[in-house]
Amino acid sequence: MPSRREFLEFSAAALAGAVARKAEAAPETADGEWRNRQPGMSYRRLGRTGYLISEVGMGGNLIAPDRHEHVLLAVDMGLNYFDTAPVYGEGKSEQGYALVVKARGRDRVFLNSKVSLWDLNRNRLYQEIFDSLPAPEQKRLRHAVRERMESSGALETDYIADYFKDQRAELEAATLSDVMAERYGGRIDRGKHYRQLILDSVDGSLRRLGTDYLDLLMCPHGANTPTEVKHPEIAEAFERLRKAGKVRHFGVSAHTNPAGILETAIDLGHYAAAMIAVNIINHRYLGKALDRARQAEVGVIAMKAARPVHPGDGRYEPSPARVRKIQEAVPGPLKVPLKAYAWVLRDARVAAVISEMGDAALVRENLGLAAPRPRG
């Protein structure tokens, strides 16, 4: 049995090996917007935003005013991309980041928030209409929803990957809204519930973050269907926010059907970035979309890189076959989440991976993957 020193040396060697196999980072002379550049961190260009973001970004779900000190350490180590949303801790995530920005400086980080209530509000409105309909019409709509979900391919086991308990229910709710919009869309005040909701959400985020602009805004937050992304009111709100100087670039996030949603975002033209589920389990479904994103300069940030192969908070237990897949792809003593992040960072079409880092130990561990590749 190896000694502790031997194990640490073996682990360090494994980490160095993982770093060596990453895709090429942006060179020091790369054009674009640099923030918080540190010699121990690698950066990649986020599509046509021009932002040079750290290869590992800070997930915001665990951040709060009383839980943000480790984020200060991450900034000191070169991390420069913060992800958050109003729904994280009911605004506490944004408030926690505000303390970091105040301590380290707004010009050192890229801030991304989202419009968390957009799709939830839309689904609520259509569910209320659905509940008022006669039983035969409800039956027809349910049948149409099932057909559309099955034909979309979004339910394939390795594609949907089941990252959280209500993922399939969210897809069903979004699909019901899509189907109902074709006949009952006129009952919705789209200006109020689609466009104005976005404007109000951004004002709230700016207030909680203590800033007057976002570098990136994602809407919808957790899109489930391509139809959700196509609403013209989203583009109209984006343009108002851009002209007001409140948001610089726009994106979308998606756990479910990430390829379909990414391709739709590319086709629409007003999206400069997307944060989608990318991992060793769903990767085979994403090739065409990732290629198109690179050609269109739509920056891709990977989330849920580790969720299919690691229990995380304990609410998900990955299958042995999935764990074995990442162990074989990235051999050695690294922890499974690190292997999952390292594997995704091999893909040059991905700008960064998002990691939920809840303490200083995880910051040091995970940011080690973003170290520059060895020369030669």
Task: Give the positions of each predicted feature.
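Conserved, mostly hydrophobic/aromatic
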Residues: L46, M58, F82, Y97, ...
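N-terminal binding-site loop/beta-alpha segment at the start of enzyme catalytic domains
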Residues: P2-L171
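Structured C-terminal cap/extension of enzyme domains
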Residues: L8, A14-G17, N80, L99-V101, ...
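Short catalytic-loop micro-motif centered on adjacent basic/acidic residues
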Residues: G57, Y81-Y88, R248-V252, A273-I276, ...
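Glycine/proline-rich, positively charged
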Residues: A135-A273, R284, K288, R346
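Active-site beta-loop-alpha junctions enriched in small/polar residues
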Residues: N61, V87, K114-W118, C219-G222, ...
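Active-site mouth loops of central-metabolism enzymes
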Residues: V56-D66, Y184-L197, I326-G332
